[in-house]
Structure formats: structure tokens, C-alpha cells
Swiss-Prot record:
Gene Ontology cellular component list: chloroplast; mitochondrial large ribosomal subunit
Keywords: Chloroplast, Plastid, Ribonucleoprotein, Ribosomal protein
HAMAP family to which the protein is assigned, alphabetical: Ribosomal_bL27
Compartments where found: Plastid, Chloroplast
InterPro entries (alphabetical): Ribosomal_bL27, Ribosomal_bL27_CS
Residue span of region Disordered: 1-23
A molecular function GO annotation: structural constituent of ribosome
Pfam families: Ribosomal_L27 (PF01016)
UniProt similarity note: Belongs to the bacterial ribosomal protein bL27 family.
Name of this protein: Large ribosomal subunit protein bL27c
GO annotation terms (biological process): translation
Length: 84
């Protein structure tokens, strides 16, 4: 039996908690004002019409309406809220 744990074994065994990032409301869904649309790191998706963003880059609806995704240009995705 070894009297030592082996090199590095006590330095391992940790992992961070999942951050639950991603799209929370998809295109065509009806949302209320204040609903979180996307949680992200950085500006992967840009806020469009009637969409605000928080200090952690969370996109949220400013008014009641329907979610619509489009492209601002070739590489920038944008989220809009369209009124009924």
C-alpha cells in the first residue's frame, strides 16, 4: 500500500458549475416584456428592435410581442421583438 496519494491526485477533482447559457426563447415564440431571450458571454447575438441587454450581455424583451431572429450582416445575428 502506498503511503502517499500519488502525484497530483489531491490537486484534481474540481469542476465549475454549468452556467445555463443559451437561447431561452426561440423564433416565433410569444413573449412578455422583461422575458429573458438569450443568456450569453459577449455579444454573440446583438439586440435588435424592442430588445435590451444587461451588463452580463443577457438579451431581454422590452415589449410584449413575437421573437424574430435575423442577420445584421453576414456574421452578426440579431434578435427582434415584433408586435402583433
Amino acid at each position: 500500500m502506498a503511503h502517499k496519494k500519488g502525484a497530483g491526485s489531491t490537486k484534481n477533482g474540481r469542476d465549475s458549475n454549468a452556467k445555463r447559457l443559451g437561447v431561452k426563447r426561440f423564433g416565433g415564440e410569444t413573449v412578455k416584456a422583461g422575458s429573458i431571450l438569450i443568456r450569453q458571454r459577449g455579444m454573440k447575438f446583438k439586440p435588435g428592435v424592442n430588445v435590451g441587454y444587461g451588463k452580463d450581455f443577457t438579451l431581454f424583451a422590452l415589449i410584449d410581442g413575437t421573437v424574430k431572429f435575423d442577420y445584421k450582416d453576414a456574421q452578426h445575428k440579431r434578435v427582434n421583438i415584433i408586435t402583433q
